[in-house]
């Protein structure tokens, strides 16, 4: 059977990234409390395409993804990237996974449990020299009270919900929970999925006792 893809290309154009994008696939990720957690990720997988190739082997992306699906972890990302380069005859490889991650949180006073979902991402790349770059990212909902409005007002201050995106470049494993807690501890108050009246009182008083402007910088200072 004639294989057009494997025939040489004479246009002499190298393409930085070819592959698949936004493929939804079930994965298993590490969970600090329970050991592991099942979720569904939106996945991007790319490799470079040499100037003399017409195209890459698209089916191999999904084949490799299916093999790694039972245990996707930060520790394995480097091996996955090198495996992509090997099986697709590429010099560089890129892998991105974005998924909802669930953590059970208890309300601060009533201790009523509920699940919070956080958007998490893991991104990795391997260049032609074999240098690995790994980034873990979390998006954390928070509550903030404005210290400026509190200063100029006789009563109260304006408050708002927001999202803090924290990205960490790493070489050793890091828990998603640690990154999330780092952000929540830097906010005026963190967010809960379940609140009773006693909890509403608690989070309101805590937020207004802890007005914050620059939550992102506060998170960085706490990490350092």
Language-model segments: what does each one mean?
Residues 1-223:
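N-terminal intrinsically disordered, cationic/polar leader segments
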């Amino acid at each position: 059977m004639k294989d057009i893809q494997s025939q040489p290309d004479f246009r002499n154009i190298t393409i930085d990234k070819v592959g698949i994008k936004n493929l939804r696939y079930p994965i298993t990720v590490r969970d600090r409390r329970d050991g592991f957690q099942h979720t569904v990720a939106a996945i991007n997988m790319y490799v470079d395409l040499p100037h003399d190739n017409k195209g890459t082997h698209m089916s191999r992306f999904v084949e490799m993804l299916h093999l790694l699906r039972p245990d996707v972890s930060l520790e394995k990302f480097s091996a996955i990237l090198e495996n992509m380069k090997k099986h697709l005859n590429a010099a560089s490889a890129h892998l991105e996974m974005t998924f909802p991650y669930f953590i059970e949180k208890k309300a601060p006073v009533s201790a009523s449990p509920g699940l919070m979902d956080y958007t998490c991402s893991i991104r990795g790349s391997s260049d032609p020299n074999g240098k690995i770059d790994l980034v873990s990212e979390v998006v954390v909902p928070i509550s903030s009270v404005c210290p400026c409005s509190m200063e100029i007002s006789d009563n109260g201050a304006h408050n708002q919900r927001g999202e803090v995106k924290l990205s960490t470049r790493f070489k050793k494993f890091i828990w998603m929970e640690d990154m999330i807690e780092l952000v929540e501890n830097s906010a005026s108050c963190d967010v809960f999925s379940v609140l009773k009246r006693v909890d509403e009182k608690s989070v309101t008083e805590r937020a207004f006792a802890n007005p914050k402007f620059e939550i992102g910088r506060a998170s960085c200072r706490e990490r350092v």
